Amino acid sequence: MIDEQTEKRRGSFWRELPILLGVAILVAVLVRAFVLQTFYIPSPSMEHTLNVWDRVLVNKLVYDFREPRRGEIVVFKAPTDWQSGAEGEDFIKRVIGTPGDNVVCCDEQQRLKINGQSLDEPYIYTDADGTRNQVADQEFNITVPPGRLWVMGDHREASGDSLEHYEQSTATDEAGKIDDATITIDSVVGRAFTVFWPASRATWLSVPEGYDAIPDAAGK
């Protein structure tokens, strides 16, 4: 025989269930909107750090408290002239230069130099026969404007990034070319910090050690 208290508890549970589900849905929506969001990788531009169809988790809150840092992988809303499809298209690239940084290609060993310090980039794409992408396919010497970022894909030869848009810019002056090639910090959605799918590729997306040696930009 079921006692009266048990019946009351069961009845209370079923009455509260819709409220609990509603709260759970609201929390999930708020987390997705303001804290964490998943993204899939649609192109080879970040191989082999990120492969096509990898799923990454993005922290959307971190840049409310600080600016993006060199070496971090960020998701951002692509500038209009970067887009190939729908308006508001999301891109994912690695931050190479932050405001005030002088980014130069290249030193004697064909490495980028940031604020006078050469940068080792072991993550740059290498194909099946061991041929490594060039760091860049042309020389350049730029200073990142305030409020903007210079971003590049790890698969340099397959990435529509700051270098490509610098090369393709139709601006008639250097400042205009750099504006065309950089993205605004305000356009950054968040930092990709882990690959979580497929499970065989699960890993943290930490900042490579080479960035530790880069000095601050002049005046910082």
Predicted feature residues:
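Soluble "head" domains of membrane/secretory-pathway proteins
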Residues: 2-14, 18-19, 30, 34-40, ...
